[in-house]
Design a protein with these regions (language model features):
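Alpha/beta-hydrolase active-site loop
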Residues: 124-150, 171-173, 180-198, 203, ...
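Short beta-to-alpha linker loops that shape the active-site pocket of alpha/beta-hydrolase fold enzymes
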Residues: 45, 111-115, 288
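The feature captures the conserved acid-bearing segment of alpha/beta-hydrolase catalytic domains
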Residues: 200-279
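Domain-level recognition of soluble alpha/beta enzyme cores
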Residues: 19-82, 301
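Residue in the alpha/beta-hydrolase core beta-strand immediately N-terminal to the catalytic nucleophile
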Residues: 156-158, 227
Length: 320
């Protein structure tokens, strides 16, 4: 299924090339809006050298094969900004970012401050506009590195993201949020996992945010197309909020009606967001569930998660 997701975005953004292991570099990027640096990663077509590594591997998840420190091929390459989900990290989308790099893209991803695995504050992490600032800063950083900028094609810049990162990609493409519309949904919606009641239980307070921040446009005119996998925050969003969105949009939904996560269901039976993008390319991956977009789990992964009281992210529907 993950290969299909990568292929779907490749059709939108990248012309596939011969697949060699992706080159990889860890980078630090200044994020003045956070008052600190953020960790990032470059994934790129390699031309030799580097140390073979399984990036992001741990007791629960298998890692992603990369060549750490490999030489970068000549380019120029399209640039893709990648955004992980709330509480995720760079490695959580490693299968996708490495796959895009192997296919001929220069990909940059960051650990979003306040909303990553070991740096998490829900109230701060829900300030979705800081995530667009993160990726804008990453793109600015890339453009300021002469050796990297020479290999980048800045006429082909794209954004991709998963869950909260899916919203980040859409917002960079011009979509605007609707705080009161989202809050109204929370007042009328039945309790459902990972949505309103769960946010409140975890200590989030939607009334603490200002519409001026939540609803403001965050479009970056350098973005030519976006792909969003199970994007969050689409409740309350109407056609007026999408009027500045780039034309080339790929929406990927995970699961059928029985297995879709309500918080990220953009279908007619969910937020209905899909009806406001008549020109978008829509793909549904089933059988699947929201967490099917995470890396492949190891055999002992479910037991480790259960012992730690963590979310059952390894419990994919049969046949996934």
């Amino acid at each position: 299924m993950k290969h299909l997701l990568a292929a779907g975005f490749l059709l939108l953004a990248v012309q596939a090339a011969a697949a060699e292991p992706a080159g990889f570099r860890s980078v630090a990027i200044s994020a003045g809006h956070h008052g600190r640096d953020m960790s990032g990663a470059l994934w790129y077509p390699s031309s030799g050298g580097g140390e073979a590594n399984s990036y992001g591997e741990n007791g629960v998840f298998f890692g992603t094969r990369v060549l750490d420190g490999a030489q970068m091929a000549e380019g120029p390459f399209p640039v893709i900004l990648a955004s992980h989900g709330l509480g995720g990290n760079i490695g959580a989308l490693g299968w996708l970012t490495a796959g895009l790099a192997e296919a001929g893209a220069l990909v940059i991803s960051v650990n979003h401050p306040n909303s990553t695995t070991r740096d998490f504050n829900l109230q701060e992490g829900l300030k979705h506009w800081t995530r667009t600032q993160d990726l804008r800063a990453a793109l600015d950083w890339l453009a300021a590195q002469p050796d990297l900028a020479a290999r980048a094609d800045f006429s082909r810049v794209y954004a991709v993201g998963y869950s909260a990162g899916g919203w980040t990609a859409l917002a960079l493409g011009g979509l605007r949020a609707n705080l009161w519309g989202y809050a109204a949904r929370c007042e009328t919606a039945p309790p459902s996992p990972w949505q309103c009641a769960d946010l409140t239980r975890r200590g989030a307070d939607l009334t603490a945010y200002s519409p001026e921040d939540w609803d403001a446009g965050r479009k970056d005119d350098r973005i030519r197309a976006v792909a969003a996998i199970d994007p969050a925050l689409t409740y309350g969003v109407g056609r007026v909020h999408a009027r500045d969105l780039v034309e080339r949009v790929l929406l990927i939904g995970l699961g059928n009606r029985e297995t879709r996560l309500p918080a990220t269901d953009f279908s007619a039976t969910g937020s209905g967001f899909v009806s406001h993008l008549p020109a978008a390319e829509i793909e549904t991956m089933a059988p699947a569930a929201h967490f099917s977009a995470l890396p492949a789990c190891k055999p002992r992964g479910p037991a480790i998660l259960a012992a730690e009281g963590d979310d059952p992210v390894c419990d994919d529907p049969p046949g996934t």
